């Protein structure tokens, strides 16, 4: 745990030439370096081997699905996931001595990254009226303060129960049970913030607000569009699925304002060709559009589909599905 406050880490950013491939051996070394900096080698190994396994724990790094049991890799996670899970499993601890040393005004000037790197809390802390430091507080008093706030509301619906999307299933179940017993279903989470609009639109157009395909569907798709997102950054395990698509003869079209290294070439870190070979080119085509140009692109594609359907009725559009 560092005792000196560090400010915005963006001050240390360096601009380097763009990469032309992603993952490979560097992803393995970076993940292990970070993980071993958080906890012991034994704890690191036990944690990593349990990620996304049938009797293990879900990786909190992203929402990319796991293959069916029996088809999963022993290491069913990416560099981001390894860092993420060991960030949660860290052995670092923030004690009352830390808060005695650092005033709230000091901590306010620290970066989020630095604050997170100090470790996990060991007991409840409170800021007293007029106080300059967080102070330790007993659990009974802490729960009493929360109860007093809830009792002071005119209606249960004035309360909102928002927690991290990284919360485990058991804790999430208890939270929603508590909120409903209190009298409200105001239980938003990060999925509302990320996918409320897409879920609403998909419900109106497709009848369901979430994806309806399986990983096997992606593996055997003839064509996959990757639009407006960077799988190498957002959910790198998608690259292994796209690699499988390519090896089964499918094509991938990337639509974005900037090319991403992961969609240019993917070096699978659990395969020899990924560690010592050239890896697999992912995107067959890169459609370079301006920011906000995706709507115009799909309007043009829809027009071409309609023209092709007019030229050969019944051979382009799935009328039964529509």
Residue ranges of predicted features:
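Intrinsically disordered, low-structural-confidence terminal and linker regions
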Residues: 1-65
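Low-complexity, highly charged intrinsically disordered N-terminal segments
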Residues: 59, 84-136, 143, 156-158, ...
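Long, well-ordered, tryptophan-enriched scaffold segments
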Residues: 93-109, 115-116, 120, 249, ...
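Gly-rich Lys/Arg/Thr-decorated short loops/hinges at beta-loop-alpha junctions or inter-strand turns
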Residues: 120-131, 196-199, 220-222, 281
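Glycine-rich phosphate/diphosphate-binding loops that line cofactor/substrate pockets in enzymes
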Residues: 140-159, 213-222, 245-248
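Anionic-ligand anchoring segments at beta-strand to alpha-helix junctions in alpha/beta enzyme folds, i.e.
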Residues: 158-220
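A conserved hydrophobic secondary-structure block that centers on an alpha-helix together
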Residues: 170, 213-264
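Short acidic, glycine/serine/threonine-rich loops at helix termini
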Residues: 171-178, 199-203, 236-239, 263-269, ...
């Amino acid at each position: 745990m560092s005792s000196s406050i560090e400010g915005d880490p963006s001050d240390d950013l360096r601009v380097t030439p763009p990469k032309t491939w992603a993952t490979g051996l560097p992803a393995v070394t970076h993940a292990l370096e970070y993980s071993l900096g958080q906890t012991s080698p034994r704890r690191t190994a036990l944690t990593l081997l349990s990620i996304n396994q049938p009797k293990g724990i879900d990786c909190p790094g992203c929402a990319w699905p796991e293959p069916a049991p029996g088809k999963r890799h022993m290491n069913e996670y990416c560099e981001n996931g390894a860092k993420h899970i060991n960030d949660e499993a860290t052995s670092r601890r923030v004690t009352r001595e830390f808060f005695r040393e650092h005033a709230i005004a000091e901590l306010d000037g620290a970066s989020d990254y630095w604050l997170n790197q100090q470790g996990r809390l060991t007991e409840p802390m409170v800021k007293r009226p007029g106080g300059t430091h967080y102070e330790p507080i007993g659990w009974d008093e802490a729960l009493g303060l929360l109860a007093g706030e809830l009792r002071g509301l005119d209606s249960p619906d004035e309360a909102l129960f928002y927690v991290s999307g990284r919360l485990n299933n058991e804790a999430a179940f208890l939270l929603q049970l508590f909120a409903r017993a209190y009298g409200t279903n105001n239980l938003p989470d990060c999925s509302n913030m990320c996918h409320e609009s897409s879920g609403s639109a998909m419900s109106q157009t497709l009848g369901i607000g979430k994806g309806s395909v399986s990983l096997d569907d992606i593996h055997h798709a003839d064509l996959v569009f990757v639009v407006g997102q960077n799988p190498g950054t957002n959910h790198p395990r998608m690259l292994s699925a796209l690699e499988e698509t390519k090896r089964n003869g499918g094509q991938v079209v990337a639509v974005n304002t900037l090319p991403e290294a992961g969609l240019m070439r993917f070096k699978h870190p659990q395969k020899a060709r990924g560690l010592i070979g050239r890896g697999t080119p992912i995107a067959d085509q890169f459609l370079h559009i301006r920011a906000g140009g995706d709507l115009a692109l799909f309007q043009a594609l829809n027009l071409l589909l309609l023209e092709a359907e007019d030229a050969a009725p019944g051979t382009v559009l799935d009328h039964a599905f529509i």
